[in-house]
């Protein structure tokens, strides 16, 4: 599954779909990722103020990779 997430809501929907595809409940994902259940609930609801570090931990627990692509015509940072 590939997705270009543009909003917190898009990201929440993406995480929910991947979680359900893996047969996990929200509490199970929270346990595997080492975050609280409320964080998963807020993430999947599209809360715009979630913590990026925890988000990355959840994505890693789901086996997802994050790629950031610089705008065309710009140099990549070293």
For each predicted feature, which ranges?
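Short basic helix-loop element that most often maps to the first helix and adjoining turn
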Residues: 13-32, 57
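Acidic-residue sensor for enzyme active/binding pockets
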Residues: 26, 44, 60
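Short, basic-rich loop-to-helix N-cap that marks the start of a DNA-contacting helix
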Residues: 47-59
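A detector for short, charged/polar N-terminal pre-domain segments
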Residues: 1-10
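Recognition helix of helix-turn-helix/homeodomain-like DNA-binding domains
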Residues: 34-48
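Short, charged recognition helix plus adjacent turn
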Residues: 60, 67-78
């Amino acid at each position: 599954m590939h997705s270009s997430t543009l909003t917190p809501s898009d990201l929440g929907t993406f995480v929910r779909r991947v979680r359900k595809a893996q047969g996990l409940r929200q509490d199970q994902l929270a346990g595997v990722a080492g975050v609280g259940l409320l964080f998963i609930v807020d993430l999947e609801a599209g809360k715009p103020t979630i913590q990026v570090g925890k988000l990355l931990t959840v994505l890693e627990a789901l086996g997802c990779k994050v790629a950031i692509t610089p705008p065309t015509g710009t140099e990549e940072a070293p």
